[in-house]
Amino acid sequence: MKKLFFSLCLACFVLGTAVAQLKTPEQFLGYKPGDRFTPHHRMVDYFEYVAAQNPNIKLIQYGETNEKRPLILAILSSPENMARLEQIRTDNLKRTGLLSGTPSTQVPINWMSFNVHGNESVGMEAAISTFHTLADPNNAKVQAWLKNQVIILDPAINPDGRDRYSNWYNQKMHTQLQPDLQSMEHNEPWPGGRANHYLFDLNRDWAWQVQVESQQRLKMYQQWMPQLHLDFHEQGIDNPFYMAPAAEPLHEQLTPFQHEFQEIFGRNTAKYFDQMGRFYFTKERFDLLYPSYGDTYPMYNGAIGMTIEQGGGGRAGIGGYNAVGDTVTLSSRIAGHYTAALSAVEMTNAHASRLVTEFERYFKTNSTAPKGTYKSFVIKGESNPAQVAKLLELLDKNGIRYGKGTAKTGLKGYEYQSGKVSVPFSTSDKDIVISAYQPKSVLTQVLFEPNPALHDSITYDITSWAMPYAYGLKAFALDTRLDPSGSYEKPTAAPTKVTGTPVAYLAPWQGTRDAAF
């Protein structure tokens, strides 16, 4: 028994010593954060190293890019929370109504995403520094914060674009700091690192999920449904730091608490920026309207979504002059994002109970009393089958529930094709019915609303995106409740048998899917 006790004590001592001696990014990578850009695979190496040292970290590879780079998440919390991590996750889904049952835990989930634009190059560097601080067992303050939250950290949403930029920059950079923006290292050639392998902007793909990175990430997102999501970006070298609260237009579906928590986060982060003597701005440029961003998509899924914008971008490199002659360094840019990330962790800890309570209230309202103008949407059965199939695929990706209609007459609604209100129509079992009385009510209403309300004439992106228009479908929106009668059987296309030796093909064209024959 004494030998067993001694062995257990020795094992605990060795484990504790290993974690206590956790290497810093500088010790592991061989250079100070901000001295050069880290290749994606070296970031993965560091995350794997830290996760191997700390039992309170779960590292997940949730997918891979077109160029076969791994997409990873790091999940961190206290030992108590990590021991019941799956219960916390499923309890959170119960809160949304996506799973049945009553939750027994009250732990909010704080998700932070970096480098959706590859050449907004500080993102992954800041993620590395943030990860080290969150994983450091000797940081008593942070470890106390982790008792009241689960943190999910995605260090690089767009590894292909990120490496396209960092590989180019590391090849062209001077041996000494060269802040002159006319030098080669400050003039990235086409196509640049902003987009992914197929030159698609992943920051516009949250709702549509056209790209593999988005498809794989959103599958994970739907499994957790966080209370908080921070989306870390960069802007031009002459811009100061942007933090929430956001600018107008602000979508009418946003709740008072979502606005309030943006203010809470902004005030706390501004406090630290004031202490550091750093410039920042709020309530300008970055609005909350278009539904496929890393702030609005979480907002329409019940979270507090926030964009964070550091000044610098790919042009700044590891250091560049701005318009007033100051040198904007990579290390100072890391400090900006690092400060905002830890501010979010601090405020999640301080408001953990309310984040969970308001989140649960949000989804209860969705299912029982949706507040949007339209309560139901009908896609007519005679619509283009290929386009209907694409729409249903999109709804499935976003967890939006739908079903088939029944034979009903005397209905009136907004007709998308004509733009007229109170148009009489009837339904049949060939139609698709999407009710707003469901967990994904807000996202449903936002994606289908024909005319989003605008309170400001200047917006950051497009102002209309209604799905019936996007897919060219005959559809109606009702201001009354209409429930589906059962599951809808998706249209399938039977393969055409080709006989003989064809010299050409003639196929009906109703959508891009008809090219696959």
Regions of interest found by a model, annotated:
Residues 182-200:
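Aromatic- and acidic-residue-enriched carbohydrate-binding clefts of CAZyme catalytic domains
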Residues 157-159, 234-236, 312:
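Active-site-proximal loop/turn and secondary-structure-junction residues that shape catalytic pockets
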Residues 21-121, 125-137, 142-150, 198, ...:
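Intrinsic-disorder/low-complexity accessory segments
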